[in-house]
From Swiss-Prot:
This is Rab11 family-interacting protein 4. The gene is rab11fip4. It is a peripheral membrane protein. The lineage of its organism: Eukaryota, Metazoa, Chordata, Craniata, Vertebrata. GO terms for biological process: cell division; regulation of cytokinesis. It comes from Xenopus tropicalis (Western clawed frog). Residues 570-632 form the FIP-RBD domain. Ca(2+) 2 binds at residues 63, 65, 69, 74. GO terms for molecular function: calcium ion binding; protein homodimerization activity; small GTPase binding. Acts as a regulator of endocytic traffic by participating in membrane delivery. Required for the abscission step in cytokinesis, possibly by acting as an 'address tag' delivering recycling endosome membranes to the cleavage furrow during late cytokinesis. Its main location: membrane. Gene3D superfamilies: 1.20.5.2440, EF-hand (1.10.238.10). It is found in: Recycling endosome membrane; Cleavage furrow; Midbody; Cytoplasmic vesicle. Residues 152-182, 218-257 are annotated as: Disordered.
Length: 633
């Protein structure tokens, strides 16, 4: 089973270890212990160890549905999908959602990979590289720690027997399946050149130090962290995991000649962006190796490696061998690796040259298109200048026409404003005159209203008095009518009585004459006495009736006098009202036409009432006492 392949976690033991460590990382990120990691909390933790864009990309891969939180199943799904184990995730975890981009290329050593294999992890997963470093830090495993474990295994492989060599290789495969499975295939490949590029063929001491240069950094000073160097915390963890033993002096490793020749070529200036990224990554690896060598002066070999060396030496001495043969074999294997790496780099340079030629053709095509576009731009610029010239001419003509129109309108508006100003001044003068007349008319109206109110009050008083006098006149007329009827009845009764007395007197006279003629009547003395007594009674009755008649006449005269006096008083009041009305003639000049017409109607009504009243008085006098109207000398 190859290291770094997706089938590595398929072993139940490896799968359990892998999921257990993923669970430890998930629990470390789950601060609330509710079974979910908030994306904000995850990004905040990631910003402490990586750049913001990389952390955001990683969070987007772990939370593809943008739910705002990451469950353990999604967490495992994202990590395994980044490792290229999407099919394995669907089979084991039962995840059915759409997974991020994955890598299914089988694992091959760095020096034996094809260009297509390298382009995947080196170019397409740059953000995943930093994201995987974040997960490795959470799990306590960093790049430096992995390099230390890898170099420790190399020491065991070179200084042990063939049987121990096989066992160590199996143990390394277990580590790759369990611990190294947190990385993408490309990221695991990035670690191998660091170990292999440090070998040299100069001396045996340099070979030993190059083999052990990634195992432990000793007690030297901490180096500054940079994107191309391991984190100091990872170095401290490596120091804690390794046992302190005897130190072995280190020597600087050598970068392959073919790579350095490629870096110094003049063709780097015309490489495309994809090639520049590849070369930058190689330069970064070389800088990291140099930085590790420069900042680790006191590297120590681990106690395990030192024990293996002693055991290997004892086995070799017992078998009449020497360590130099082992060193020679190791050097041969390293030379083979370097040769393979150089051949791979030559192949890569050839591909880059082909890409450069292709890019040259594309560049020529783009130049021709650019020339065509430049000519087109020049034509459009000429057209634009012509349009600008025409537009300026049209603008000048329109501006001139608008200025003339504006001046004409300004003159017309000026003349209109002068006329309107004169009209406004005239209206203001008329308004002032009207205000003066209005004030005078208001005062005159107030005075007329007061006079009218006084006349109206007097008219109401006169009307009340006239009504009272009319009532009194009606009562007196009723009483006079009753007296006339009573007097008429008494007069008729008196006339009847007188007629009766006359008839009786005539009858008595006739009876007396007959008695005297016949001589047969009663005695004359008695008859005369009866006649005399009867005459006396009649005379008394006549006097009484005369007195009553005289009294009635006196009462009638009194009533006529009262009626006349009342009529005269009413006439005087009407004449006084007419006089007062005539006193208003002085105000005719200041009164309006409507007021004059109303006053004239009132005067005519008063005159009509006076005529009717005079006619009534004359008729009453003619009926009751015509002697009043007689003209006496």
């Amino acid at each position: 089973m190859e290291r770094g392949s997706c089938s590595a976690p398929g072993d139940p033991g490896h799968l359990g270890l892998f999921l257990q460590r993923l669970r430890q990382v998930f629990d470390a990120c789950d601060g609330d212990a509710d079974g979910f990691i908030k994306v904000e909390h995850f990004v905040a933790l990631g910003l402490q160890f990586a750049q913001g864009d990389e952390v955001k990309k990683l969070a987007k891969r772990l939370d593809p549905n943008a739910q705002g939180r990451i469950g353990f199943k999604d967490f495992c799904h994202g990590v395994l999908a980044m490792k290229g184990c999407d099919k394995f995730v669907k089979g084991i975890l039962g995840v059915t959602g759409t997974a991020p981009q994955h890598y299914e290329a089988p694992y091959t050593p760095y020096y034996y990979q094809s260009p297509e294999t390298i382009e995947g992890p080196f170019l397409d997963t740059e953000s995943s590289y930093s994201d995987s470093e974040f997960f490795a830090y959470e799990d306590g495993l960093t790049l430096s720690h992995r390099d230390a474990q890898h170099e420790s295994d190399l020491d065991s492989a070179m200084y042990s027997t063939p049987s121990s060599e096989a066992s160590d290789e199996g143990r390394n495969e277990d580590k790759a399946g369990g611990l190294g499975s947190l990385y993408l295939p490309g990221e695991q490949n990035l670690l191998k050149p660091s170990a292999g590029s440090g070998f040299s063929t100069h001396s045996t001491a340099s070979l030993i130090s190059n083999e052990e240069q990634f195992e432990d950094y000793g007690e030297g000073e901490d180096i500054d962290y940079s994107p191309g160097s391991p984190c100091p915390d990872d170095e401290s963890r490596t120091n804690a995991l390794s046992d302190l033993g005897s130190s072995v002096p280190s020597s600087a490793g050598q970068t392959p000649r073919k790579a350095r020749l490629m870096y110094n070529t003049d063709l780097l200036d015309i490489y495309c962006t994809q090639c520049s990224k590849k070369i930058t990554l190689l330069n970064d690896l070389e800088a990291r190796l140099k930085n590790l060598k420069a900042n680790s002066p006191n590297r120590k070999i681990s106690s395990t490696a030192f024990g293996r060396q002693l055991l290997h030496n004892s086995n070799l001495s017992s078998s009449n061998g020497s360590t130099e043969d082992l060193f020679r074999d190791s050097i041969d294997s390293c030379e083979n690796d370097i040769t393979e790496k150089v051949s791979f780099l030559e192949k890569k340079v050839t591909e880059l040259e082909n890409d450069n030629l292709t890019n040259g053709d594309v560049k020529n095509k783009l130049k021709h298109e650019n020339i065509h576009l430049v000519h087109r731009v020049h034509e459009l610029e000429e057209f634009l200048r012509d349009q600008e010239t025409k537009s300026e001419q049209v603008l000048d003509e329109e501006s001139k026409r608008h200025r003339e129109t504006y001046s004409k309108l300004a003159r017309e508006k000026g003349t209109e404003i002068v006329l309107l100003s004169a009209r406004v001044q005239e209206l203001q003068e008329e308004n002032e005159d009207l205000l003066t007349s209005l004030t005078r008319l208001k005062s005159h109206t107030v005075r007329i209203d007061e006079e009218r109110q006084r006349v109206w009050d007097k008219l109401e008083d006169t009307s009340l008095r006239l009504k009272d006098e009319t009532d009194l006149y009606k009562r007196l007329m009723d009483k006079l009518r009753q007296n006339r009827l009573h007097f008429q009845k008494e007069r008729e009764a008196t006339q009847e009585l007188i007629e009766d007395l006359r008839r009786e007197l005539d009858h008595l006279q006739i009876y007396k004459l007959e008695c005297e003629r016949s001589g047969r009547g009663p005695p004359s003395g008695l008859t005369e006495l009866n006649v005399k007594s009867r005459e006396v009674e009649l005379e008394q009755e006549i006097r009484r009736l005369k007195q009553d008649n005289q009294k009635l006449r006196d009462q009638n005269d009194d009533l006529n006098g009262q009626i006349l006096s009342l009529s005269l008083y009413e006439a005087k009041s009407l004449f006084s009202t007419q006089t007062k009305a005539q006193s208003l003639a002085a105000e005719i000049d200041s009164a309006s036409k409507d007021e004059l017409m109303e006053a004239l109607k009132e005067q005519e009504e008063i005159n009509y009432r006076l005529r009717q009243y005079m006619d009534k008085i004359i008729l009453a006098i003619l009926d009751h006492n015509p002697s009043i109207l007689e003209i006496k000398n």
